[in-house]
């Protein structure tokens, strides 16, 4: 008599239906969902549309918790770009464990500098002039989307001037004052005659609604780029810039104390609570549950982030520009889709060839890029939003990867072997042997399984080994 042996461990793939309506992208005709741990689910949904054909979206729904928290990752410097695998490598080299990542802000292809605001680990590491919509994340994992406009000033105790940009490129002929830290890069990248003020930070930090005290080390004029000393702050401007600003900087001297202040214009204190944030020139997709529609036309791959009414956060990507696989979407369509997913607020991030999502799935040794970037390769971009995995080893088995003869038919009297290839604990760390796995055969037959996973098959019917 034939019988079938089935092996069941804690299964990774959840073949549950996607509950949100998906009419805006077409009729759902496939997909999958995976529980990542840390209150995080990864979804793929496949659609077919009569008007544009196939669509493939990949998104994560995250319930805020401290086992995994959203952070913004730039890499070693603001200047330059890196692809998502390089960003993950940077994280791991610095003791950070990525769970899920998506690309974030628009950026200059020439310099790699993001076009908006970036706050990382409680510090403003890139500031634009004027306001933009932005997403902020607190240390407990909660998030919000709100207008962000930071006014930065530097004062010598008597007079103050505006600092328009933090860690942006000071180009020849530009008027304003810039502030650079060693996070900008190794040098200032300046190409004209500038006045430089080298300072040592004393107290405080570059954060919203906070001040930082500086001591002036040196003031000088130089034509070209200079090194940014580690741990120092550099105030600079083109010597042909605004005379009021130039006069202020030129009067400074070594030993003088300065105060840098950053204030969120028109804010109610919300931005002071954030530890990580990124803005976007791509604009707001959803405001108070209503999809915005005032967008330029044109379908493309898309990346977005949204906040649901219950506080859950959606990290969203939609592939595009790939005939027969995924068409992409217009921004007004993306906005409607974010509403379908339950978002009350949503922000459009850099899309097109930049759209990328990666994940470290349970039972795997490293991350993998899940979507299909439209360039055909991983584009290097300015920065990313990652879920940083804070979980520590538990040594409690969760995912069991096996080899051997499973889900096959056998004759009574035969023996089948189940071999464990690897075991991952409930925090998705690979466990070392011995695994202390115990087998049990659930069956109406006389079949048995021993402590080594050898199944003796007797009788007729299915054998489930758990």
Question: Where do the model's predicted regions map?
Answer:
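Sec-dependent N-terminal signal peptides of Gram-positive bacterial secreted proteins and lipoproteins
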Residues: 4-22
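Zymogen propeptides
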Residues: 21-236
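Conserved, well-ordered active-site substructure
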Residues: 48, 109-137, 275-343, 354-404
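Solvent-exposed loop/turn segments at secondary-structure junctions
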Residues: 66-67, 105-109, 142-143, 151-152, ...
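Short alpha-helix capping/helix-loop boundary micro-motifs
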Residues: 235-250
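Loop/turn positions that initiate beta-strands
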Residues: 252-259
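Short, Lys/Arg- and Gly-enriched loop/turn segments at beta-strand edges
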Residues: 263-277
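Extracytoplasmic soluble-region selector
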Residues: 394-466
């Amino acid at each position: 008599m034939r019988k079938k042996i089935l092996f069941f461990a804690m299964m990774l793939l959840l073949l549950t239906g996607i509950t949100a309506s998906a009419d805006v992208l077409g009729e759902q005709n496939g997909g999958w969902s995976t529980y990542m741990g840390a209150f995080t689910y990864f979804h793929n949904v496949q659609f077919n549309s009569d008007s544009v054909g196939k669509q493939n979206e990949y998104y994560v729904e995250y319930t805020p918790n401290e086992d995994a928290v959203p952070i913004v990752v730039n890499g070693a410097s603001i200047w330059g770009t890196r692809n998502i695998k390089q960003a993950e490598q940077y994280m791991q080299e610095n003791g950070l464990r990525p769970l899920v990542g998506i690309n974030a802000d628009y950026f200059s292809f020439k310099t790699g500098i993001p076009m908006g605001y970036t706050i990382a680990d409680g510090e403003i590491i890139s500031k634009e002039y004027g306001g933009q919509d932005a997403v902020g994340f607190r240390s407990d994992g909660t998030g919000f989307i709100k207008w962000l406009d930071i006014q930065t000033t530097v004062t010598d105790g008597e007079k103050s001037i505006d600092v328009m940009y933090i860690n942006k490129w000071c180009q020849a002929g530009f008027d304003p004052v810039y502030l650079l830290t060693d996070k900008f890069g190794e040098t200032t990248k300046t190409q004209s005659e500038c006045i430089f003020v080298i300072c040592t930070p004393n107290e405080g930090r570059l954060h919203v609604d906070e001040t930082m005290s500086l001591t002036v080390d040196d003031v000088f004029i130089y034509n070209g780029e200079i090194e940014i000393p580690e741990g120092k702050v550099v105030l600079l401007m083109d010597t042909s810039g605004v005379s009021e600003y130039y006069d202020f900087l030129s009067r400074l001297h070594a030993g003088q104390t300065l105060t840098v202040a950053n204030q969120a214009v028109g804010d109610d204190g919300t931005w002071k609570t954030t530890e990580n944030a990124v803005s976007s020139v791509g604009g707001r997709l959803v405001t108070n549950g209503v999809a915005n529609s005032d967008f330029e036309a044109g379908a493309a791959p898309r990346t977005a982030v949204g906040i649901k009414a219950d506080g859950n956060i959606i990290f969203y990507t939609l592939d595009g520009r790939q005939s027969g696989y995924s068409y992409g979407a217009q921004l007004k369509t993306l906005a409607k889709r974010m509403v379908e997913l339950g978002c009350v607020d949503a922000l459009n991030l850099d899309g097109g060839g930049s759209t990328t999502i990666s994940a470290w799935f349970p039972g795997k040794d490293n991350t993998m890029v899940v979507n299909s970037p439209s360039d055909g390769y991983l584009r290097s971009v300015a920065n990313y939003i990652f879920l940083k995995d804070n979980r520590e080893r538990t040594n409690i088995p969760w995912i069991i990867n096996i080899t051997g003869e499973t889900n096959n038919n056998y004759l009574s009297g035969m023996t089948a072997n189940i071999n464990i290839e690897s075991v991952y604990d409930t925090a998705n760390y690979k466990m070392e042997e011995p695994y202390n796995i115990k087998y049990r055969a659930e069956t109406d037959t006389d079949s048995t399984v021993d402590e080594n996973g050898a199944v003796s098959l007797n009788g007729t019917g299915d054998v489930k080994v758990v």
